[in-house]
């Protein structure tokens, strides 16, 4: 057996010097395991299987989404809108026996129709409705499609059918329902004008206003 060089120790003495005098390899391994547990407890442990691990993962995911686990999560729901049918004209859905009443009667409750009649001259082909505080519009024999339907007036304004004080009559021959509109109705009175009876065709706009008490024909459609 060759002698070792200067400064070199045999393997047995090297192990003993590292383990300590009187300590075995088994003791060193057990101590290393305890030291590993102490160091591992200070680190973030991975999520375990079970309830505790699942809750920890959900809280961390919630914190990543909202910044805090206590804040409510905003949920965005996207619904696909199907192709909507085109709006149907009001006078197109009236009953045949209501043809003489195709026009829409508009009158003001505050008694200022003289102001409207004054701006309607014999040369005016398309009269305009000036601002009013309250206007009531009467629809004759108007069957709505659904309770969520809207009426579009010219100028475009939306009035829900469900705001009617009384339900519309669907099959009554002499039913006349009206809705009360609070607000302003400014713009062109007709564009284009609905079909008119021969009696109304022979009268001018100014004579219609005087004869029928400022009766104005409006374009209405349902959407």
Swiss-Prot record:
Ranges for region Disordered: 40-70
Q: Which InterPro entries match?
A: DUF5553
Compositional bias segments (type: Basic and acidic residues): 51-70
Identify the domain of life: Eukaryota
Q: What is this protein called?
A: Uncharacterized protein LINC03042
Q: Which source organism does the UniProt entry give?
A: Homo sapiens
| Gene encoding the protein | LINC03042
């Amino acid at each position: 057996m060759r002698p070792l060089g200067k400064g070199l120790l045999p393997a047995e003495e090297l192990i003993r010097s590292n383990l300590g005098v009187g300590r075995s390899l088994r003791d060193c391994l057990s101590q290393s395991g305890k030291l590993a547990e102490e160091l591992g407890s200070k680190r973030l442990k991975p999520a375990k299987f079970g309830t505790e691990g699942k809750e920890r993962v959900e809280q961390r995911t919630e914190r990543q989404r909202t910044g805090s686990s206590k804040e409510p999560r905003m949920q965005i729901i996207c619904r696909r809108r199907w192709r909507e049918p085109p709006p149907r004209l009001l006078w197109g859905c009236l009953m045949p026996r209501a043809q003489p009443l195709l026009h829409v009667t508009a009158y003001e409750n505050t008694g200022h129709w003289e102001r409207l009649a004054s701006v309607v001259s014999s040369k005016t082909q398309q009269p305009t409705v000036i601002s009013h505080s309250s206007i009531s519009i009467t629809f004759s024999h108007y069957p709505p499609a659904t309770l969520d339907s809207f009426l579009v007036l010219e100028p475009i304004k939306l009035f829900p059918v469900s705001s009617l004080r009384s339900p519309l009559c669907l099959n009554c021959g002499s039913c006349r329902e009206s809705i009360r509109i609070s607000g302003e109705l400014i713009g062109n009175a007709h564009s284009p004008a609905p079909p008119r009876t021969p009696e109304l065709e022979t009268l001018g706009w100014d004579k219609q206003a005087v004869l029928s008490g400022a009766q104005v024909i409006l374009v209405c459609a349902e959407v």
